[in-house]
Amino acid sequence: MTIGMIISGHQQTTACTGITLNAGDNARIVARTIEWGGSELNSRYVIVPRGYTQRSYIPGYTLDGMSFTAKYGYVGLSVEQKEFVVEGLNETGLSAGLFYFPGYGQYEEYDASLKDSSITDFQLVSYLLGSCSTTDEVKEAVKKVHVIAIDPRSSTVHWRFADASGRQIVLEIVNGEARFYDNKLGVLTNSPGFEWQMTNLNNYVNLYSGTAEAHKFGDVQLASFGAGSGFLGIPGDVTPPSRFVRAAFFQTTAPKQATAAGTVRQAFQILNNFDIPVGIEFPAGEVHADIPSATQWTTATDMTNKVIYYRTMYDSSIRSIDLNKIDFTKCKYFNAPLDKTKEQPFIPVKTR
């Protein structure tokens, strides 16, 4: 299975939801899901040391694009191939994530004469994590490269970058032009574009946290059926615009937790609401993969304390990778599957 097959085969199965939370101790947490119902993504975590050199794929799936060497060490989570890091954090606290963006982005056409500065969209996260420490540096680095697709059938993607200062930006490439947007809200999903998603929030200006007050409607007394009716009308489907709205409201109404650890746990709790069952994405009776969930993994990244947390469709226990415990000047490149076993463990309860 190749990335081209993944993102061209069934666009309706590709989804991602990202949120941002701030802790009372000033820790910054970015968290996200990644969905794909067509096949197992064979995801891995990778540890990339300083000085490690990679080369980009180009159309035809050959490793003949630009070469890039990591100035900073980083940890990333990949899909399908270890080179395709779609979420990661580097030792300076820069976070980067790739989100599907079908139907709205357009990269420039690949030009073989520019291959030494051409990089595939699925390796851009790796390049920027290894090269940059701030969002301003990300902007400058993107100007120097040509972002291309490996496969002309492929969906495009867009990206979220956040640095230690708290600034977060979104990158979308439309008509071959890189467009950056400040993301003060800290939410990202998929298509349409980020500006449209932010404008669409205005359609839900009537929503609020809490419960609607009882009042008279003529001679009839009306009262809410239950708590939380201030959110009545929030969209509940799994399309990107609906997920964007829900993520925005769930994130902004969540009570601030005192610590980074509490905020990480809160991020996972919020993102529970965005898990996508396999069956709803395809026609009735059509099954594309023997996997337990279309939401294949969820991550929360503590940018301040430099720890990546993740859980998967096979194991909902939360695991962590602490970048502070990695010496990026001495370690070797390493990659391993996110799961050692592909089955949710059951833990017996001692009854006496």
Feature map (PLM): residue ranges:
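C-terminus-biased signal that marks the final domain/tail of proteins
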Residues: 14-29, 37, 42-43, 141, ...
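Surface loops and adjacent helix of pleckstrin homology
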Residues: 33, 173-174, 183, 311-313
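A contiguous strand-loop segment
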Residues: 15-113, 153, 352
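Short, basic/low-complexity N-terminal boundary segments at the transition from targeting/disordered tails
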Residues: 61-74, 131-144, 269-283
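Acidic/His-rich structured neighborhood in mature extracellular/periplasmic domains
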Residues: 87, 92-122, 142-203
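Compact, glycine/acidic-enriched structural inserts
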Residues: 45-63, 105-145, 330-342
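Bacterial N-terminal signal peptides
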Residues: 1-8
